[in-house]
Structures are given as structure tokens and as C-alpha cells.
Amino acid sequence: THLFQPSLVLDMAKVLLDN
């Protein structure tokens, strides 16, 4: 099972915002 990790989402959102 693939658990959803908030840290991963925050990191991706951070990259999107930085871009």
C-alpha cells in the first residue's frame, strides 16, 4: 500500500511555488 506522505506534498508544493 502506498501511504500518502504530507512531507512529500509539501516538498512538491514548495518546488511548484518556487518555480
From Swiss-Prot:
GO terms under cellular component: extracellular region; interphotoreceptor matrix
Localization (cell): Secreted, Extracellular space, Extracellular matrix, Interphotoreceptor matrix
Keyword annotations of the record: Extracellular matrix, Secreted, Transport, Vitamin A
GO molecular-function terms, A-Z: retinal binding
Main localization (coarse): secreted
Statement: the UniProt record of this protein carries the keyword Secreted: yes
Entry keyword annotation includes Transport: yes
Domain of life: Eukaryota
Function: IRBP shuttles 11-cis and all trans retinoids between the retinol isomerase in the pigment epithelium and the visual pigments in the photoreceptor cells of the retina.
Name listed for the protein in its UniProt record: Retinol-binding protein 3
Source organism (scientific name): Cavia porcellus (Guinea pig)
Upper classification of the organism: Eukaryota, Metazoa, Chordata, Craniata, Vertebrata
